Curated annotation (Swiss-Prot):
UniProt-listed GO biological process terms: one-carbon metabolic process; S-adenosylmethionine biosynthetic process
Gene Ontology annotations for the cellular component aspect, listed alphabetically: cytoplasm
Pathway connected to this protein: Amino-acid biosynthesis; S-adenosyl-L-methionine biosynthesis; S-adenosyl-L-methionine from L-methionine: step 1/1
Enzyme class label: transferase
Protein's organism: Cupriavidus metallidurans (strain ATCC 43123 / DSM 2839 / NBRC 102507 / CH34) (Ralstonia metallidurans)
EC assignment: 2.5.1.6
GO MF term list: ATP binding; magnesium ion binding; methionine adenosyltransferase activity
Binding site for Mg(2+): 18
Matching InterPro entries: ADOMET_SYNTHASE_CS, S-AdoMet_synt_C, S-AdoMet_synt_central, S-AdoMet_synt_N, S-AdoMet_synthetase, S-AdoMet_synthetase_sfam
UniProt binding sites for K(+): 44
Record-given protein name: S-adenosylmethionine synthase
Residue segments, region Flexible loop: 100-110
Length: 387
């Protein structure tokens, strides 16, 4: 890729049907972890018009009212009226959970290469990424895509724009010059709305009340605004589209700025490295950038089911490193325990903290529960690198 280019990322609101599913899955996970922190959970959710289906594999001693958890999550999101696409009071909730396969459990409970440590819950590859485009060390396009739909939700909830509805999508296209964000080329924002509001009113309010307060003014030079470009967005949420857990994995991570290993996060307990190792890889990458070892850092880790130690830990800094990528990778392996049990202890992951992650991005948010966003290893890495 040349140093001058356009790059686009998107986000969706908490009311998007796939995000409704993600939040229900993580609400189920949290409810279980609150009672049984060693539970094995793989909770999947489907939501459609008037229907929620809960399925997957759960092994736990917890006693959870899964139907009530689903209804409360839908209520919190704001779907309390059938006109919005689904109503928490009247929707049907079907529960079809099974237990974790004993074949999987035996490999996770006792690692084949280290009997003192938990084996990975599956094979797979995971990526973490950080860059210095924003103070949160996230790529500019995905960071601001999240903030746009987050503000849409805020204005809906506090009543400033009472005609807003829960479902919304954003997309930010950024012009890069010399490899750095230079200006916002295009913003797309589509929001579900009440039927009696005009397109002109929607456009003005979205631009003035949502977009301009969020995006840095100096980046809005010749920006194109596309607001509800179909002209109407009344039918939304699970009525407009069927929602499924795990269908927004690029929204959840880096907006396409980094590769993705393919494994979704929501509904999975920390023994699933799809989730825990991706969080750890973000933690590593963010600390590398915070330490000043590189302006950009991509970390890949991979695992085999039942084996504790990662097969590889690979660092790529895209030519921005102060020391070689190989030396950074060696420092990472020295200062971060990337075995599944080590990750859980390092990041304190056996907590009911996951529903909050399921909308507006798992990364780049300074939430107190998000231990993987800490930069507490930066000084250690910098000293070890001799900088």
């Amino acid at each position: 890729m040349s140093n001058d280019f356009l790059f686009t990322s998107e986000s969706v609101s908490e009311g998007h049907p796939d995000k409704v599913a993600d939040q229900i899955s993580d609400a189920v996970l949290d409810a279980i972890l609150a009672q049984d922190k060693y539970a094995r959970v793989a909770a999947e959710t489907l939501c459609n018009t008037g229907l929620v289906v809960l399925a997957g594999e759960i092994t736990t001693t917890a006693n959870v009212d899964y139907i009530q958890v689903a209804r409360e999550t839908i209520k919190r999101i704001g779907y309390d009226n059938t006109e919005y696409g689904i109503d928490y009071k009247g929707c049907a909730v079907l529960v079809a959970y099974d237990k974790q396969s004993p074949d999987i459990a035996q490999g996770v409970d006792r690692a084949s290469d280290d009997y003192l440590n938990q084996g990975a819950g599956d094979q797979g590859l995971m990526f973490g990424y950080a860059c210095d485009e924003t103070p949160e060390l996230m790529p500019f396009p995905i960071y601001y895509s999240h903030r746009l739909v987050e503000r849409q939700s805020l204005l809906r909830r506090d009543g400033r724009l009472p005609w807003l509805r829960p479902d919304a999508k954003s997309q930010v296209t950024v012009r890069y010059v010399d490899g750095r964000p230079h200006s916002v080329d295009t913003v797309v924002l589509s929001t579900q709305h009440a039927p009696d509001i005009s397109q002109a009113q929607i456009r003005e309010a979205v631009i003035e009340e949502i977009i301009k307060p969020v995006l840095p003014a100096e980046m809005l030079k010749e920006t194109k605004y596309l607001v509800n470009p179909t002209g109407r967005f009344v039918i939304g949420g699970p009525q407009g589209d069927c929602g499924l857990t795990g269908r927004k994995i690029i929204v959840d991570t880096y907006g396409g700025a980094s590769p993705h290993g393919g494994g979704a996060f929501s509904g999975k307990d920390p023994s699933k490295v799809d989730r825990s190792a991706a969080y750890a890889a973000r933690y590593v990458a963010k600390n590398v950038v915070a330490a000043g070892l590189a302006r950009q850092c991509q970390v890949q880790v991979s695992y085999a089911i039942g084996v504790a130690r990662p097969i590889n830990v690979t660092v790529y800094t895209e030519g921005t490193g102060k020391i070689s990528d190989e030396k950074i990778a060696a420092l990472v392996q020295e200062h971060f325990d990337l075995r599944p049990k080590g990750i859980v202890q390092m990041l304190d992951l056996l907590r009911p903290i996951y529903e909050k992650t399921a909308a507006y991005g798992h990364f780049g948010r300074e939430e107190p529960e998000f231990s993987w966003e800490a930069t507490d290893k930066a000084a250690i890495l910098r000293a070890a690198a001799g900088l």
